[in-house]
Swiss-Prot record:
It comes from Stutzerimonas stutzeri (strain A1501). SUPFAM superfamilies: Ribosomal protein L10-like. This is Large ribosomal subunit protein uL10. It comes from the Bacteria. Keywords: Ribonucleoprotein, Ribosomal protein, RNA-binding, rRNA-binding. PROSITE patterns: RIBOSOMAL_L10. The keyword Ribosomal protein applies. The lineage of its organism: Bacteria, Pseudomonadati, Pseudomonadota, Gammaproteobacteria, Pseudomonadales.
């Protein structure tokens, strides 16, 4: 099915805007995945703030040109599903990784983060990045642990001085 030039320009502009706003991108081959499963994936992605779209490779190459995701140009072969994480970098990788567990035909091709190419076998690195909330919780637990250790140390010093004075 031929796409009109105006429609092609609109697709390129839409994907380019998503690429400029994206923190990371994941590329996959969804050939053979059922429509129902893809609808579920899109719904989950939308809830997580991830932009997902199937785009022709030539249009995709033009859309990511000049962005941090042009390192992915070599994997734009065959049917291409691309996802851009807008809120936290690991969101798209995490969603695609979970989806791939239940779908034999869903194949993650590659990812990009901060202008660096990540092969499919390195997707776990990106997927394991904590969300903003998880990062804040980890930071707070570290601060709380250090604070409580300081309080225990000060209490021990006080007890030592009281014992020495008595």
């Amino acid at each position: 099915m031929a796409i009109k030039l105006e429609d092609k320009k609109a697709i390129v502009a839409e994907v380019n805007e998503a690429a400029k706003a994206g923190l990371s991108a994941v590329v996959a081959d969804a050939r053979g995945v059922t429509v129902g499963a893809m609808t579920g994936l899109r719904k989950e992605a939308r809830a997580a703030g991830v932009y997902v779209k199937v785009v022709r490779n030539t249009l995709l190459k033009r859309a990511v040109e000049g962005t941090q995701f042009d390192v992915l140009n070599d994997v734009f072969k065959g049917p291409t599903l691309i996802a851009f994480s807008n809120e936290h970098p690991g969101a798209a990788a995490r969603i695609f990784k979970e989806f791939a567990k239940g779908q034999d035909k869903f194949e993650i091709k590659a990812a990009a983060f901060e202008g660096k190419f990540l092969a499919a076998n390195q997707i776990d690195v990106l997927a394991s990045l904590p969300t903003r909330e998880e990062g804040i919780a980890q930071l707070m637990s570290v601060i709380q642990g250090a604070t409580s250790k300081l309080a225990r140390t000060l209490a021990a010093i006080r007890d030592q001085k009281e014992a020495a004075a008595a």
